[in-house]
């Protein structure tokens, strides 16, 4: 008996099967029935030429050793009730300790206790913690107080985990994030707060009334923490240009670059031969400037890329006004955006809040703010990515539609009464279409099955994904810390409620990640919901809540947005669609 080893992919699992080339399709289906429990009549197996038929000659399918085939179908109700012994011992929630319960899929994340006007810090930390790559890099960080981990564990058992962290700010952040991952309760960030105040005394200022510490600006806390991480988190650069050279993690994943041009506003300076000054700047956030004409984030970002500076002009021999224009030459993977909502007022000696409503998108296209060179690299990739996402959305909608129709047919208790009108419509449409075609042509028409149509769509999406990857310039492909699509998705928001930066209340919103598939390890589609962190209170909110954070009063207004680059598509070539 001649046999060919193939791999059959079904519901995320891969099965190794020996195909008897002397048998037919029905025999092969019974083989798969013994492995998957899906009855032959409920199987849809995609092979060359379409769907595998029962009478197909397996020797004529052109199967190759190691080839992957895709199988669709689920067992009927008779088989779904078969009870199998679980592979792992089941552990119930009441039998788990706090750390195990906190790490369950879908568990509510830990909040942070307010230690006296520390909501500015709590909201900042929750959004920073939403960056998974940062958490991973912090775990690799070793500070001078690395030996404190045992004492930290001991204090944690006494409910004083926040006291056992490192005095180094970066090490303290590492310890805090780790401890937050082991509880669902409001955690006291005592040691991190002490480390923050030691490193930056401005956060240790006392309140003017003498009671406790003063409220602080969350944007200042964000900037100072990021500056410290930039100094401490050093990694090896894997790009070809600077192989193995030390680079800051922040510079690689959260820093962008501007190309700048500065020129004098007075025509006399140009007439006397003064040339424009071209330069390069590094940025760690984009500023959204707000004025009477700012209605959308795009307006504020555009305004923030032009700046007027008064400085000495050598050719004029006096001070003159210069305009500095910036264009982005590098977009980072993680992009913070700061709404410049606070303006210093001399009459009150306070940072007054600009209440104007400024809307912001869930998906940000940053290409319009880039240099012409970067635009040429990103536009083809962005346009093709949008095509791919549209095709994937259409395919997903078609699958859901088919599933609903199938469920409706299976649950229909009176087929004649329920389906007769629809059946008559289908028959009438088929007769009308048949009558409009020549008789000899009608005989040659071959109708495609749903599985064949789906396979063709999947093949089209696969080809489009490959095309996207081919459009990425070598320069961008070598920089894995840069945005390679030009598109961003919103992942976190820090908000402020109140009239000034030194008063009011800060909270944060972080988008929920999709559940992780235990078989493949990949994350499933997200449900679109968000976590709202209000100090130690954590609740789940709908996506519509985020659009209410545009401002327009003293209510919760977005202060910092954290965007993450839309990644390049992943090409799964396990399944042959040819």
Regions picked out by a protein language model, each given a short descriptive name:
Residues 1-578:
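UBL (ubiquitin/ubiquitin-like) substrate-recognition surfaces
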């Amino acid at each position: 008996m001649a046999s060919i080893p193939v791999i059959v992919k079904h519901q995320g699992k891969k099965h190794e099967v020996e195909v008897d080339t002397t048998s037919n399709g029905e025999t092969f289906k019974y083989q798969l029935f013994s492995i998957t429990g899906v009855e032959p009549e409920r199987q849809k197996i995609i092979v060359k030429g379409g769907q595998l038929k029962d009478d197909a000659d397996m020797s004529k399918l052109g199967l190759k050793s190691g080839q992957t085939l895709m199988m669709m179908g689920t067992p009927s109700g008779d088989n779904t009730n078969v009870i199998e012994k679980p592979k792992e011992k089941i552990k119930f929630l009441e039998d788990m300790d706090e750390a195990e319960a906190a790490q369950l899929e879908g568990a509510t994340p830990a909040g942070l206790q307010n230690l006296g006007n520390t909501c500015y810090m709590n909201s900042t930390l929750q959004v920073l913690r939403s960056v998974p790559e940062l958490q991973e890099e912090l775990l690799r960080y070793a500070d001078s107080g690395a030996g404190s981990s045992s004492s930290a564990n001991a204090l944690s058992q006494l409910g004083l985990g926040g006291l056992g962290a490192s005095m180094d700010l970066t090490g303290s952040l590492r310890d805090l994030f780790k401890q937050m991952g082991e509880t669902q309760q409001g955690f006291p960030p005592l040691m991190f707060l002490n480390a923050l105040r030691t490193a930056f005394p401005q956060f240790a200022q006392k309140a003017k009334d003498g009671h406790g510490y003063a409220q602080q600006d969350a944007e200042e806390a964000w900037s100072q923490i990021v500056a410290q991480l930039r100094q401490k988190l050093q990694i090896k650069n894997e790009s070809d240009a600077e192989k193995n050279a030390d680079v800051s993690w922040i510079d690689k994943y959260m820093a962008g670059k501007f190309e700048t041009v500065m020129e004098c506003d007075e025509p006399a300076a140009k007439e006397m031969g003064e040339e424009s000054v071209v330069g390069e700047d590094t940025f760690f956030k984009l500023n959204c400037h707000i004025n009477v004409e700012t209605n959308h984030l795009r307006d504020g970002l555009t305004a923030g890329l032009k700046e007027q500076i008064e400085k000495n002009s050598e050719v004029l021999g006096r001070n003159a006004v210069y305009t500095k224009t910036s264009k982005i030459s590098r977009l980072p993977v993680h992009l913070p955006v700061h709404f410049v909502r606070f303006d210093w007022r001399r009459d009150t000696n306070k940072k007054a809040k600009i209440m104007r409503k400024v809307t912001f998108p869930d998906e940000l296209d940053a290409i319009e703010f880039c240099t012409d060179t970067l635009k040429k690299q990103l536009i083809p990739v962005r346009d093709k990515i949008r095509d791919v996402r549209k095709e994937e959305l259409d395919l997903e909608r078609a699958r859901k539609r088919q599933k609903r129709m199938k469920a409706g047919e299976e649950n229909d208790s009176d087929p004649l009464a329920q389906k007769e009108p629809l059946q008559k419509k289908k028959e009438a449409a088929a007769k009308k279409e048949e009558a409009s075609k020549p008789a000899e042509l009608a005989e040659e028409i071959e109708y495609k099955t749903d599985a064949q149509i789906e396979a063709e769509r999947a093949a089209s999406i696969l080809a489009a994904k490959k095309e996207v990857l081919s459009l990425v310039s070598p320069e961008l492909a070598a920089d894995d810390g840069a945005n390679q699509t030009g598109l961003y998705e919103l992942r976190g928001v820090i908000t402020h409620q109140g009239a000034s930066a030194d008063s009011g209340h800060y909270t944060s919103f972080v988008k929920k990640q999709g559940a992780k598939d235990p078989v493949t390890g990949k994350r499933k589609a997200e449900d679109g919901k968000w976590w709202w962190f209000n100090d130690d209170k954590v609740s789940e909110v709908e996506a519509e809540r985020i659009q209410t954070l545009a401002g327009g009063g003293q209510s919760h207004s977005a202060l910092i947005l954290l965007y993450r680059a839309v990644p390049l598509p992943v090409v799964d070539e396990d399944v042959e669609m040819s």
